[in-house]
From Swiss-Prot:
This is ATP phosphoribosyltransferase. It comes from the Bacteria. CDD domains: PBP2_HisGs. It is found in: Cytoplasm. The gene is hisG. InterPro entries: ATP_PRibTrfase_cat, ATP_PRibTrfase_CS, ATP_PRibTrfase_HisG, ATP_PRibTrfase_HisG_short.
Length: 215
């Protein structure tokens, strides 16, 4: 039986649509009152693990799941070994650098040397500023990073931005985009090497159907 790690939250519904097109129906995961963390497909050929987006690469890397769907932003932060197979082209949002509206910072190089930048994505933020040769202190936050500039703790933030509504409501604006993040299909490398046709059939079905998905 194929095991698939699906991300709970914003990516779940489209992830289920992707696998349904490939013949694996995990729609029971969308039942309003369900608290189950595992769901078997209707055809009984696969099961899904419902995990946090950030945990998908962990389950896939350690072999508890053969396949997974995860945001590109998570992959950029992770150092775990997974096979990166497909850009599924949904769940799109920008990883962005933002500052307070009333600041004088119009571009990254306007930020003062050694200023503080708040982010959940510390590896991504560090690599970005290193590439620009801008010395900054990255402050790791796990919650609402917008509070960094609001409270004066940080001059800027690096965070995911979808509609920009949260930034606007908190008096912040983007001054740069680091990259565009979408959902990605990943696999356990050993599963790819050892598995026979069933796993590869699922991957090929997803690859052939993703361009015609109306999601």
């Amino acid at each position: 039986m194929i095991t698939i790690a699906l991300p709970k939250g914003a990516l779940l519904e489209d992830s289920i649509s992707i696998f349904k097109k490939a013949g694996l129906n995990f729609s029971d995961a969308l039942l309003e009152n369900s608290r189950s963390l595992t769901v078997e497909s209707k055809c009984k050929r696969a099961k899904a693990l419902l995990v946090r987006n950030g945990d998908v690469p962990v389950y896939v890397s350690y072999g508890q799941a053969d396949l997974g769907i995860v945001g590109y932003d998570v992959l950029q932060e992770s150092e775990l070994k997974v096979a990166k197979l497909l850009d599924l082209e949904f769940g799109g949002c920008h990883m962005s650098l933002a500052v307070k509206n009333n600041s004088n910072y119009l571009k990254p190089t306007d930020l003062p040397a050694n200023c503080k930048v708040a982010s959940k994505f510390t590896k991504t933020a560090r690599a970005y500023f290193d590439d620009l040769n801008i010395p900054v202190e990255i402050v790791h936050l796990t919650g609402s990073v917008e509070l960094g500039p609001i409270t004066g703790m940080a001059e800027a933030i690096v965070d995911l931005v979808a509609t920009g509504k949260t930034l606007k409501e908190n008096g912040l604006s983007k001054i740069d985009d680091l990259f565009y993040s979408t959902a990605r299909l990943i696999a356990n490398p050993l599963s790819l090497r050892l598995d026979s046709n069933p796993l590869r059939d699922v991957i090929l079905s997803i690859e052939s159907s993703k361009d015609i998905l109306n999601i």
